[in-house]
Design a protein with these regions (language model features):
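Short, solvent-exposed secondary-structure boundary/capping segments
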Residues: 14-19, 79-96
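Short alpha-helix capping/helix-loop boundary micro-motifs
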Residues: 15-30
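Short beta-strand-centered aromatic/proline hotspots
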Residues: 3-7, 38, 50-78
Length: 232
């Protein structure tokens, strides 16, 4: 589900998403869909591709692979320019909405997203997606302004964390749990990122019960290091 669009970037891996407000989309996102620690994806479009190409491929029944940047929401800002502004107001909010329906409100919910890696998926019939490749780390391409931010369901989050490497030779692949973005998160300067890391581990414990013992060790070690750094 689309929850908003990219309106700004602070770096190559940190982006600001403005959550869709009333009348901006058919289904307005609820707070749980842009909660702290929520995994999201943003389509990365090559420069040569446009909407006409997508329509042409759809008519021919051809579906090209799509690359997504995968990120996590780690901060939320409520923007209200009217706060602290003194003086009389000629109209209240209800009157403005009634008599000036084209008025653009400046209030917004902004979420900060840190990109953790990339996924390439192949759209299939029936709206299903087949994951072709996964990468953890810094992507080569940046996102575009106004790109839609979509939530990821549990299955997509699992696919993002399950790597498959040839183990016993050609044709044999053993899947394993991978969190290659952890050093990438730790290197950033934000007081909220360590907490979002713990939140990510909590989610993975639910999604990968077979790896509960391993994830519990990782969480305890990370929480201990966080406590040591906080207390100095």
């Amino acid at each position: 589900m689309a929850i908003g669009k990219i309106v700004k970037s602070d770096s190559h891996i940190n982006y600001v998403c403005q959550i869709f407000g009333p009348h901006e989309t058919d289904i307005q996102p609820v707070p749980a869909e842009y909660a702290f620690g929520r995994f999201v994806r943003i389509a990365v479009r090559p420069q040569s591709q446009d909407g006409a190409d997508d329509l042409y491929d759809e008519v021919l029944g051809q579906r090209q692979p799509v690359s997504y940047a995968v990120g996590v929401i780690y901060n939320t800002i409520l923007q209200n320019p009217a706060f602290g502004v003194l003086g009389p107001r000629l109209s209240n909010e209800m009157q403005v909405e009634l008599f000036s329906p084209d008025y653009v409100t400046e209030r917004a919910i902004l979420t900060y997203i840190m990109v953790l890696g990339m996924m390439e998926v192949q759209p299939l019939a029936g709206g299903q997606l087949e994951v072709l490749s996964v990468m953890h780390g810094i992507p080569l391409l940046s996102l575009s302004l106004d790109s839609e931010v979509e939530t990821m369901d549990d299955e997509m989050v699992r696919q993002f964390h399950y790597f498959r490497d040839p183990a016993g030779g050609v044709g044999t692949q053993e899947p394993y749990l991978h969190m290659g973005y952890i050093p990438h998160i730790i290197a950033q300067h934000s007081s909220l990122l360590p907490m979002v890391t713990l939140r990510i581990i909590d989610q993975l414990e639910r999604l990968f019960p077979q790896h509960l013992a391993l994830l519990s060790i990782v969480k305890r070690n990370f929480a201990w290091h966080l406590k040591v750094e906080t207390t100095g």
